[in-house]
Structure formats: structure tokens, C-alpha cells
Amino acid sequence: METTGQAQEIIVRQPLLEDLVDTFLKDQDIAGSSRSTYSRSLLKYLSWLRETSRSERLSSLQRDDILAYKDYLLTQKLSSYTVSLYITAIRKLYQWLESKKIYPDITRGVKGTKKPKGYRKDSLTPDQLREALRKIDRRSQEGLRDYALFNLMARTGLRDVEVSRTLVGDIRSEAGQAVLWIQGKGKDTKDDFVLLTKEAMRPLKIYLRTRGRLSEEAPLFSSNSDRNNGEGMTTRSISRIIKTALIRAGMDDKRLTAHSLRHTAITLSIVGGASLQQAQAMARHSDPRTTLVYFHNLDRISAGAEKCIDF
């Protein structure tokens, strides 16, 4: 590694920068999924440096270069959330580089994009939920699995990553109520749960019976593919199953995704009379203000001032 005298510059050649990114990722105390997200984000940044010949002058990169990368991202038809995610990964990298006295933080003052207010995905109506479930063919084990999966997510607000981590033994009884213990987003342990109502449990029991005798360590939802038969399902597979069910029910809308079932569960719980505390507990929001967004959106619709206009 060469330095250039008084300046804090370090002439970093591309292989070395990639090595630094690898070291940065290993040094982060974050969940594996977050590490993968950072990795993808930073690989895109490294690729852009090569494409714009900036990899040839890594030692002299400045804040303007980061702003140029941000402008590039904004031309790629990416969502504001994705752009902010990419910028956050770069900020974390340069903050780490500065803390290690390797390179100054040239991202200081660079902001992500402005995120839209409210929640990001549309929610479904009860009629739409019933139609999507009706379209799932339950004549096979795979169909029973998909039905139980869709139904569970719509009734509990589980995230796809939370579903992917669940095991058969995570179904337990608390005070006489069936619950499913889960490892939440960004958590290292299964320290929270969702209630399993009779409506949530019934399809789940039917599906589990088709799999025969299962150990407590068996995945709650298992893959039926030749390559991963019997293994736990990935978040990608879960998302695909939900999306397929929605499309078959005539809801081919990019705004409707597996995460829409989470928004749907929270919204329907509030419509059904859940308090802020109850909805927050089910959604496992650390900040009640996140849950309040759902209340505000529903109030805005039901009590909109536009309805008072008459001429």
C-alpha cells in the first residue's frame, strides 16, 4: 500500500479496494441478510467505479464522485428505498475506512433520497384475500403448503424472512393459546411470537399432517423441489408463491407483493378494532409511530375533508 506524503491519500488499487470491502463486511456486527444486502450494494458501486474509469484514481475520489454515483442511481429507475439502501452501504463503508485510518469519509453530508410517506405496498381487501386463497389448488401437498403459507401471513403479518426461519417446534402454547415463536427482522434469537387463531392453525395442521412424523427441528414450510426437497424455504420462494397466488386471482400489480400481506394483516386488525398497542405488538414495531401510520392512513380515508365538499 503506497501513501503520498502529507495527504492522507492511500493509493488503493482495485483488487485492494475489493479486499477492503470484504474485510469491512466481515467486521460488521449485523445479520447475515444485512451483510448480503451490503455486499450486493457495494459490488454495484465497485462496478460503477470500473465503468466510469474511476477505479484508476481511487486515491483521489471525492464527495463529488459519490454525488455522481447517486445521480447515476437515480437514472436507473430504482425505487427511492433502493437508492437510499445503496447510499447507506457506501456511507457505512467510508465511515469504517476512516475509523481504520485507511481513507477519509467522502460521503459526509451525502443524503439518501426522500422516501414517500406512509407504507410502501398496497394492502388487500377481505374479498381479495378470499379470492387469492380460493385460486390455490389444494389437491397436492405443495398446494396445501402454499394455502397454509398465504393464510398464515395474511392472518399474522409475518415477514417472509420470519416465515423462512420458523421450525415445527416453534409452534407452542402460551396460556392456552397456540402461538408461533419467531426470529424477527434484525434479531438473533426467537424472542417474540404471533398468535395462531383457529383460522390460522387449521390449514397449517392439514399441511403438516401430509408430511408425516416431523422432528421439532424440521422447517415449518419445506421445499418440494428436487434440489432442496425437505429443506426450509427461502424468502425468494416464499415471495414467489405469494405473488403467483395473487396473479392467479387477477391481481397482477407490482405493488402487491408478499409484504402486502403484512400491511393487510395490520390494516385489517385496526379495522377490526385493535388498539394501537395491540396492533404494534402483532406487527412487532419497535416504535409505535410506525404503527400509527396505519391509523393515520385509515383515518385520512374514512374522515377525509373532501367528503365535506358539496356544490
Regions found by a protein language model. Give the residues of each.
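Conserved catalytic core of the tyrosine transesterase superfamily
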Residues: 1-311
